[in-house]
């Protein structure tokens, strides 16, 4: 109401923390009496303090004024509850269950299902012949069994002439081109070649081999002229030492592991062996000793 001031509440530091309300007598307000006859009653508040002594609220505890007759409402209102409702603890929400699902196993191709072969995976004659229940003719009408037999006989006939794959490859390269090199001859004999390539090589190799056999019947020199190289040198037979010779050589080696040329000649004459054989024996013996000393370094005592 105008003209009425409320008492102010302050704390120990002089800070304003609230104001005390004034209660006006409702009975006097209801009458049309002049404003100066109004009765004002002071309300004595009760202060609410916290643990630190600070005022947190005020409660009015003075007697209430005389009630005024009021028409009872049609619907009773529920009295306000002054009790502080306890805070119900919220139920802990369980964490979402994690379900681990194993991936579906990959379907294994059935053993009976045929595997498609691309152009880069063309099977060789050896792979086709080695498979069980393989027809003798492939898709292009090439007789695989005939090629296999010819490759086997070609190798036997080549060795009987004393020719190597390199000699055959050099002779064919000079007359037919680089497609008939030593590597091509090697793959053909091992059947490590596609059926089409084998079918292309077969007539050329057969013609050349027949000609080489005719030249060989006329003489080894004619064959070498046809092949275009010197006769192949036979490998020298390996020399075997007797136990007495080995004992004598070891005795010489203990005295002098690196003999001079004159000393090697004298040892060879004494043991009745070729000088080159004795020289090679000393070289091999020194290399064996060197390798043995290297191994001893890594041995744990």
From Swiss-Prot:
Residues 66-88 are annotated as: Disordered. The gene is Pou6f1. Transmembrane segments: none annotated. Residues 139-213 form the POU-specific domain. One of its GO terms (cellular component) is nucleus. GO terms for molecular function: DNA binding; DNA-binding transcription factor activity, RNA polymerase II-specific; DNA-binding transcription repressor activity, RNA polymerase II-specific; RNA polymerase II cis-regulatory region sequence-specific DNA binding; sequence-specific DNA binding; sequence-specific double-stranded DNA binding. InterPro entries: HD, Homeodomain-like_sf, Lambda_DNA-bd_dom_sf, POU, POU_dom, POU_domain_TF. In the embryo, widely expressed, with highest levels in the developing brain and spinal cord. In the adult, mostly found in the brain, where it is diffusely expressed with the exception of an enrichment in layer IV of the neocortex. Also found in kidney, lung, heart, adrenal, skin, and placenta. Low levels in spleen, muscle, liver, anterior pituitary, testis and ovary. SMART domains: HOX, POU. Residues 11-56 are annotated as: 2 X 7 AA repeats of N-A-Q-G-Q-V-I. PANTHER family: POU DOMAIN (PTHR11636), POU DOMAIN, CLASS 6, TRANSCRIPTION FACTOR 1 (PTHR11636:SF6). Residues 234-293 bind DNA. Its main location: nucleus. The keyword Nucleus applies. Keywords: DNA-binding, Homeobox, Nucleus, Repeat, Transcription, Transcription regulation. This is POU domain, class 6, transcription factor 1. It is found in: Nucleus. Contains two direct repeats of 7 amino acids in the N-terminus. Sequence repeats lie at residues 11-17, 50-56. One of its GO terms (biological process) is negative regulation of transcription by RNA polymerase II. Transcription factor that binds preferentially to a variant of the octamer motif (5'-ATGATAAT-3'). It comes from the Eukaryota.
